[in-house]
């Protein structure tokens, strides 16, 4: 096998779908409660909004509802554009490494980094435990640049990230640092 291809999951993670649904549902609820207090009409199918005074509670609920809906639309846009998604491609026959990621719309929506295997010094494994654990694999070039190879989001299991780093270092036939 001369080629290795790793897909990188971007913003199309389960947690993003869940937070989009939660913020949209909450936003609709708050917006309808605020509008109900303004119009004097029961817009919510549950609960009683007759006791909510428009100033100040109704205005605040309308504001929070609008913010919740806008946040859910932003998350939905991220999911549909797959921001952060892409691939890592390693081809031993041509000696090329390609790292591709998608970003936000604009001039630099598509990011493609290309390196030769000869330019790579090592695979670096960075592990930091604590309240916000960080477990990442980096491609370290001979000019000391570190290019992250792992996806953003929830950290992988320690055994899983170590196994991935060892497999990649063995495949590229370069040393592994930080293990």
UniProtKB/Swiss-Prot annotation:
It is a multi-pass membrane protein. It comes from the Eukaryota. One of its GO terms (cellular component) is chloroplast thylakoid membrane. It is found in: Plastid, Chloroplast thylakoid membrane. One of its GO terms (biological process) is photosynthesis. Keywords: Chloroplast, Membrane, Photosynthesis, Plastid, Thylakoid, Transmembrane, Transmembrane helix. InterPro entries: PSI_Ycf4_assembly. The chain crosses the membrane at residues 21-41, 59-79. Seems to be required for the assembly of the photosystem I complex. Belongs to the Ycf4 family. HAMAP family: Ycf4. This is Photosystem I assembly protein Ycf4.
